[in-house]
Amino acid sequence: MKRFISACILTIPLLLSACTPPIPPDVLASYAEKEVLCANGDVIVKASENTQNVIQSGIDLYVTSCPDAKVSIDNEAKDPNIVVTDYSAAEPEMCNAAIITTSLMNQFSTLVYYGEGLDGIFLSPEAVRGLLTGEITNWNDQKIAVTNPDFELPNIPVTFVEVENLHASDKAFIEWIKTITGKDIEIKPSKVVPDFQTLLQDFGTLNGVFSLLPSNIIYDNALTYANLKINDQDFLFESTAFAAASSQVSIFAETNKVTGALNSEVQPATDIGTSSTTNSWHGISYYDYGLCKDDADNSARTFMRFLSRLDAQGQFETYGYFALTEPLRVKVAGKIGEKLPTPSFNPEDLAQN
């Protein structure tokens, strides 16, 4: 028996699988963070005008480690290798027979506005509902005043401008407000425009305008956004609230799929370095990406694996998107990496995990 163990230890670097049980994908994924896999086949990513910048940032980071990689974005591609979507009408349709589908990143929505004397206001769910349904027609309405006692609210008419196709995070925000108020919400914009570029023309020029927008548009254009006051508690539209919401996740793992969804029954994770939790922002959606086709070298899968790395996820916030919570991210990386080369590591490290 001792000889067997001794021999096993001596041959671990070469025959680890013969002496240990199969290593779970989650464990392999955590070790894979230390390495960057590269593949040089052509990879076409179908994204959208909204996600193009954040995906391009991932490509640029990938190419710094893999200079021979050939990854490009084609938002009109008929036969892409990868599709990125939130499943709303504003984003591409997922490929019909995806080889694997996993979550990629989070997005959040809130109301944004432009109006003299309105900076820094808090809105109650009742006020948000009134603005979205058209019941509130002036910014000095009592439903807005009640959560802003130190403001002398201006007498400005409300103008609600919205794009034709809402994002999934916009719809999640509406559902959140609907749940809190216990009332249906049928949004009634004063003006509907085809795209964000047209919508943004009114911000900075039309006094009293507001819209419901996703975080990437808010961040890209430095728009003034609304925080919420719910049951006398402040809910802030900021990264700690986003992290709290992303930690409230149900993970759905199937044969070819690992995705996340908000579960408000899950206790939010505590803030880093503290024992407290931030109030979660439940206007959250998940962007998924699907592997539609690949080459013999797994070039598309390799790029997807790179986007699930912590360093790649960490730069999403610059573009108004946010990293997956760690348990989901590691499971995603493990699922994507199932057909990729096993990462090298010191076998002694395995005993410590």
Protein language model features and the residues they cover:
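N-terminal segment of the mature folded domain
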Residues: 20-148, 152-154, 186-221, 231, ...
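C-terminal motif of bacterial Sec signal peptides marking the signal peptidase cleavage site
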Residues: 13-18
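Bilobed "Venus flytrap"/periplasmic-binding protein-like clamshell domains
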Residues: 49-57, 164-182
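Non-catalytic, conformational "gating/processing" segments within enzyme and secreted inhibitor domains
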Residues: 141, 149-176
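Sec/Tat-exported extracytoplasmic proteins
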Residues: 62-66, 87, 113-115, 132-140, ...
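Extracellular structured ligand-interaction cores
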Residues: 106-108, 155-157, 284-288
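Flexible, solvent-exposed loop/hinge segments that line or gate ligand/substrate-binding clefts
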Residues: 82, 87-89, 188-313, 317-353
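Sec-dependent signal peptide recognition
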Residues: 2-10
